[in-house]
Amino acid sequence: MAKTIKVTQTKSSIGRLPKHKATLLGLGLRRIGHTVEREDTPAVRGMVNLVSYMVKVEE
């Protein structure tokens, strides 16, 4: 079984760059407080790093 991380959106996407909004949707995050589990891959880590100011990550 692959290692997973929990990603939680902590800030609103209103007024953010369109690229950052698209990244949140790509991660499956829709609203503040929404948490999703994703595989810990380099692609997912890159997406999380791009929007790190809007999300919280748990190993």
Curated annotation (Swiss-Prot):
User: Which UniProt keywords are given for this protein, alphabetically ordered?
Assistant: Ribonucleoprotein, Ribosomal protein
The disulfides recorded in the entry are: none
> What are this entry's molecular-function GO terms?
structural constituent of ribosome
| SUPFAM superfamilies the record matches | Ribosomal protein L30p/L7e
Q: What's one GO BP annotation on this UniProt entry?
A: translation
- The answer to keyword Transmembrane applying to this record is no
Q: Can the keyword 4Fe-4S be found in this entry's annotation? A: no
Q: Which GO terms describe its cellular component?
A: cytosolic large ribosomal subunit
The entry sums up its family as follows: Belongs to the universal ribosomal protein uL30 family.
Subunit (UniProt): Part of the 50S ribosomal subunit.
Q: What is the name of this protein?
A: Large ribosomal subunit protein uL30
Give the organism the record lists: Serratia proteamaculans (strain 568)
